[in-house]
Amino acid sequence: DPDGAQSLYKLVYDIHKRYGTTIVAVEHRMDYLLPYVTDMIVLKEGEVAAADAFEAAAPKMYEDKALRPLLPALWQIKLGLEEKLSLDLGDWRSEQDALADFKTYGIVAKEGRAD
């Protein structure tokens, strides 16, 4: 349940911030972790495909077409825009971060699907 997952990860993050506790989460739905993740280890076929700060590991995942769908949707959009438009966008943790970058770069979102 998405609301339960969001609440759980927020609680775990609050514990981390309050007590400085290291938290290790195994999660396939990265969208839930996006606001909180700091570092990430990505496994592919039992091998480490990326191990770094989230902002450094995510582009490595994006380059691998098998791993790309596992990225949070917001970062799939971000990295796709950076690739297509040769931009260096911020480290989006929320839709508000994305909208702020859109405003900064004059990107206008239109309804429908971009191909």
PLM features: what roles do these ranges have?
Residues E47-L74:
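Conserved beta-strand-loop-alpha-helix hinge in the C-terminal portion
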Residues D115:
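Flexible loop/N-cap segments at domain edges
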Residues L33-P35:
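A short, surface-exposed alpha-helical micro-motif characterized by mixed small hydrophobic
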Residues Q6-R18:
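Helical segment within the ABC ATPase nucleotide-binding domain
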Residues P2-G4:
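Helix N-cap at the start of a conserved alpha-helix in ABC-type nucleotide-binding domains
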Residues T21:
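Switch/coupling loops of ABC transporter nucleotide-binding domains
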Residues I41:
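Conserved catalytic/dimer-interface elements of ABC ATPase nucleotide-binding domains
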Residues E27-H28:
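H-loop/switch region of ABC-family ATPase nucleotide-binding domains
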